[in-house]
């Protein structure tokens, strides 16, 4: 037996057995694992003992592991250590690959143990007890390899560079008049509850209250750990079906609100030409006090190229409202840029991933049946707890769906590439 092979507990119990040469028939397990002949010829000793159904996965992981090793060598270089900026950059790059390398090495270890156990199963002969023990180990290793393969596929997927960012979340009343404004207020509270559950910092940026309750439009700032990665799936049209408080006949009305998720952008990413801005001040109708309607603290900002108008009143000073207005403008312009890029990618991939288009109806909140239906997931959730901020199950399901579709795209791309090269 190859002495360099990682030895399983069952294998160690049989090291005294004679390893006579024989050939194992090549066959695949449900996980896509296939066996090769044993012992390998001298020319094949350096090849993989177990192979995957997707060779691209192995090639990619081997490339990642090679990069990780190269980074490890560089980090030990005294010249790099003395340059803190370079050292931190390389250390960050290496840490981002740590999980991939750890899982891949465990995957290779399990592959070797699996082949070893298969060999021992042949050597066990008629020993039923030993055959049962080896069979149990083979099943265990096969299942672990399947799970590790799934992890590796997910780790292969490109990460969204915006996932770690804070966001500005805008909810805007759609069709439905006063009821749409009230529904907008309900959604604002839902996201506030979800932020509290997630230990995020939630604050109002700019809100236009409606006459009969709720908001015509409301913009919130949410800061915390990987906010965008969770809330990016909320972009789209949210439809509600319920009997409005003002409805005397008990008829169910349908109203909508549109949610936009805008990752925070800095001044370097979005350059705003002062000549494109019209800025005026106005009197604020704040929460009360001597300054109401006496001091012009509100800011009315108009961006001429895009037609975006922002009215900020939430802060107590004109300077802070101006800063908020420009912050929101940058986020809106950046969100437009990101959305256009994502749309271009979706068109190129011919993908139907429903994770952002504003015109898309993503959910229906049905009060009569106390049910929330996510149309992308084709899943239902309990209305009361959902509106109280219990969004995590839906968020995780959206993330899983996106991963699944990205993996399908990756497999199709690899298949097309293989067909072309073949």
Swiss-Prot record:
Q: In which tissues is it expressed?
A: Expressed in roots, leaves and stems.
What does the record list as GO biological process? chloroplast organization; plastid translation; thylakoid membrane organization; translational termination
The record's Gene3D superfamilies line, in alphabetical order, gives: 3.30.160.20, 3.30.70.1660, 6.10.140.1950
Q: What is its main location?
A: plastid
Transit peptide as recorded in UniProt: 1-50
The cross-references to PROSITE patterns, in alphabetical order and at most eight, read: RF_PROK_I
**Compartments it resides in:** Plastid, Chloroplast
Q: What induces it?
A: By light.
Effects seen without this gene: Albino and pale green (apg) phenotype and early seedling growth arrest.
Q: Which family does it belong to?
A: Belongs to the prokaryotic/mitochondrial release factor family.
Function, in words: May direct the termination of translation in response to the peptide chain termination codon UAG. Required for normal chloroplast development and plays essential roles in the termination of translation in plastids.
Q: Would you tell me the protein name for this molecule?
A: Peptide chain release factor APG3, chloroplastic
- Source species, please? Arabidopsis thaliana
């Amino acid at each position: 037996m190859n002495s360099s092979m990682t030895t399983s507990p069952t294998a160690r119990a049989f090291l005294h057995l004679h390893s006579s040469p024989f050939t194992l028939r090549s066959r695949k397990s449900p996980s896509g694992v296939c066996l090769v002949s044993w012992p390998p010829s001298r020319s094949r000793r350096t090849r993989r003992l177990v192979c995957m159904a997707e060779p691209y996965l192995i090639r990619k992981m081997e490339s990642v592991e090679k990069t990780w090793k190269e980074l490890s060598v560089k980090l030990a270089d005294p010249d790099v250590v003395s340059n803190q900026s370079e050292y931190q950059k390389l250390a960050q790059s290496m840490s981002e690959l740590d999980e991939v390398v750890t899982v891949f090495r465990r995957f290779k270890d399990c592959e070797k143990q699996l082949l070893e156990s298969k060999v021992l199963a042949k050597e066990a002969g008629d020993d039923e007890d030993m055959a049962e023990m080896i069979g149990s180990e083979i099943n265990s290793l096969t299942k672990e390899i399947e799970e590790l393969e799934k992890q590796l596929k997910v780790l292969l997927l490109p990460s969204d560079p915006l996932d770690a960012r804070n966001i500005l979340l805008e909810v805007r009343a759609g069709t439905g008049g006063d009821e749409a404004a009230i529904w907008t207020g309900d959604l604002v509270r839902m996201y506030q509850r979800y932020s509290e559950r997630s230990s995020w910092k939630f604050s109002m940026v700019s809100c236009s209250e409606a006459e009969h309750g709720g908001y015509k439009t409301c913009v919130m700032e949410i800061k915390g750990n990987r906010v965008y990665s969770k809330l990016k799936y909320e972009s789209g049209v949210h439809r509600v079906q319920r009997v409005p408080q003002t409805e005397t006949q008990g008829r169910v009305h349908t109203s909508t609100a549109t949610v936009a998720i805008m990752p925070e952008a800095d001044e370097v990413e979005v350059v705003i030409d002062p000549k494109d801005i019209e800025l005026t001040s106005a009197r604020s109708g704040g929460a009360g006090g001597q300054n109401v309607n006496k001091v012009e603290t509100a800011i009315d900002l108009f961006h001429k190229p895009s037609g975006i108008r922002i009215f900020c009143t939430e802060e107590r000073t004109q300077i802070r409202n101006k800063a908020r207005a420009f912050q929101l403008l940058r986020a809106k312009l950046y969100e437009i840029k990101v959305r256009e890029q994502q749309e271009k990618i979706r068109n190129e991939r011919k993908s139907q991933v429903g994770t952002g288009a504003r015109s898309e109806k993503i959910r229906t909140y049905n009060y009569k049946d106390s049910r929330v239906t996510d149309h992308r997931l084709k899943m239902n959730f309990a209305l009361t707890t959902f509106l109280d901020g219990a969004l995590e199950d839906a968020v995780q399901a959206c993330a899983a769906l996106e991963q699944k579709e990205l993996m399908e795209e990756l497999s199709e791309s690899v298949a097309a590439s293989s067909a072309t090269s073949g």
